Design a protein with these regions (language model features):
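Short beta-strand immediately N-terminal to the catalytic nucleophile in serine-hydrolase-like folds
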Residues: 231-233, 299, 362
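Mobile cap/lid helix-loop segments that gate and shape the active-site cleft of serine hydrolases
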Residues: 254-280, 301, 306-349
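Catalytic nucleophile-loop/oxyanion-hole region of alpha/beta-hydrolase
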Residues: 167-178, 184, 189-227, 409-419
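Short beta-strand/loop motif that positions the catalytic acidic residue
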Residues: 354-355, 360-363, 367
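C-terminal catalytic histidine-bearing segment of alpha/beta-hydrolase fold enzymes
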Residues: 1-4, 362, 369-433
Length: 433
């Protein structure tokens, strides 16, 4: 904490010193000194921004190579970067994130006004869904009575996680989209899901399985049709949704075709690797039964943890994000928690009957945090294993957060969003049938 305060104070002082140095540079005698001091201040600011980000986001569960000195002392030594290139990359990402936050103020006020209205006269009901395992809740938005009276299509929106996680994971953040879909006649469910640092991916999968199981058993009481349940993931929750479904389908396919594996001679090295991989696969909380799903919507989602982590390495943000610490940290854990790796390693024995028959993938062409190649790879593998309907809705000019904001039904902030808002909602509603 003291290190962070010191770095922030030093960075702030450098920011304040720049205009004074520029003003003093107008004096001929001080001009050479100001020319020399200006690059120094810029370097201090770049390092200060990068170190502040590391001190806030990168200290917990740091990688082994980041430990300095003996274990008893390393926890007291902050993990910060010294490479100028890495600091420049991190500072650039932080500045972009701050600019994104400033641009989102209009969306925040829109959400706050909606939240205050719903607080006084809520159109949803909050229910505990995970007792006795935890005290997670879910919000249920019954369909508008004027549109449909019973057996409405059910849409579960799974919250995503990005910094700050206490905001992005909050189910109330998804209220605008839930109310929008409710008015269109859908029964919407938004559950609490635990993410890092509260837990790692196995517990997140268990939370999702419990939520889906509760919806399948009780949604009829809220005018929903249990035979038409759709689940929607955004960002990192797309990885969670895809993993939960592919994991169960891969393990069930292995159980059904185990006799074939026993009769097959594992002579080749590739076959031995495949059998070892199959032994690592398991269903988290198999006693929790999933309902039959009508379809899956994955928006701006990752599907390959390894490739996404390597992409973060190129951006210089692999230590700041939660991906490795949530889905790993070891390489084999990242592999068995990647839906595309599960599909690729089990495609010869994969039975598509264990997966929903409809998938809709929504992705922005300018998404630099999760490249659109992740969606294209997942689409090709799902089609290869025999899933009947896999659609990819690509928005050429949208970035990662633009796609999420549009799906969350927040007001668009620029022309590109306006251009894609109606087609995206049409594609979503035509898929939810």
């Amino acid at each position: 904490c003291m290190s962070l305060i010191f770095v922030l104070a030093l960075t702030g002082a450098a920011f304040l010193a720049i205009p004074m140095i520029l003003a003093a540079g107008a004096i001929p005698v001080i001009f050479p000194v100001s020319i020399l001091l200006l690059p120094v201040l810029i370097i201090v600011i770049v390092y200060g921004i990068a170190w502040s980000a590391y001190l806030v986001l990168a200290q917990s569960d740091r990688p082994p190579y980041a430990m300095i000195g003996p274990p008893s002392l390393s926890k007291y030594i902050p993990f910060v970067p010294f490479s100028p290139l890495r600091c420049l990359k991190v500072a650039k990402i932080v500045c972009e994130f701050i600019w994104l936050g400033a641009r989102s103020m209009r969306s925040f006020w829109y959400w706050y006004s909606l939240y205050r209205t719903q607080k006084n006269s809520p159109e949803y009901e909050t229910v505990l869904y995970s007792l006795p395992f935890s005290h997670n809740c879910l919000d249920i938005y019954p369909p508008d009575v004027g549109v449909v009276s019973q057996n409405a299509i059910v849409l579960m929106i799974v919250p995503t996680s990005f910094f700050p996680s206490f905001i992005s994971c909050n189910r109330k953040l998804y209220m605008p989209m839930a109310l929008r879909m409710r008015k269109l006649g859908y029964c919407v469910v938004v559950p609490d899901i635990s993410y890092y640092p509260a837990c790692q991916i196995p517990q997140s999968v268990v939370d999702l399985r419990l939520a889906l199981s509760w919806v399948g058993a009780h949604i009829f009481s809220y005018k929903g049709d249990p035979s038409r349940i759709y689940v929607m993931g955004m960002g990192i929750s797309s990885e969670l949704v895809a993993l939960t479904l592919v994991q169960e389908a891969a393990v069930m396919s292995r159980v059904v075709r185990r006799q074939d594996d026993e009769n097959q001679d594992p002579s080749s090295e590739e076959e031995l690797d495949r059998l070892k991989f199959n032994k690592l696969m398991e269903i988290y909380a198999p006693q929790v039964r999933l309902p039959s799903l009508a379809g899956v919507v994955l928006a701006a989602g990752m599907s390959d943890v390894i490739k996404c982590y390597l992409h973060n390495v190129e951006m210089g943000t692999e230590h700041l994000g939660m991906l490795r610490r949530w889905a790993g940290p070891r390489q084999y854990q990242c592999i068995i928690h990647s839906p595309t790796h599960l599909l690729n390693n089990t495609k010869d024995k994969f039975d598509p009957a264990f997966l929903p028959s409809n998938f809709l993938l929504i992705h922005g062409g300018r998404d630099k945090f999760v490249p659109i190649s992740q969606a294209a790879l997942l689409q090709s593998l799902l089609m290869e294993v025999g899933v009947k309907n896999v659609e990819l809705f690509a928005c050429r000019d949208l970035g990662h957060y633009d796609t999420l904001k549009m799906l969350l039904a927040y007001p668009p902030t620029h022309s590109d969003s306006c251009r894609y808002d109606t087609p995206m909602m049409k594609a979503l509603c035509s898929f939810l049938v």
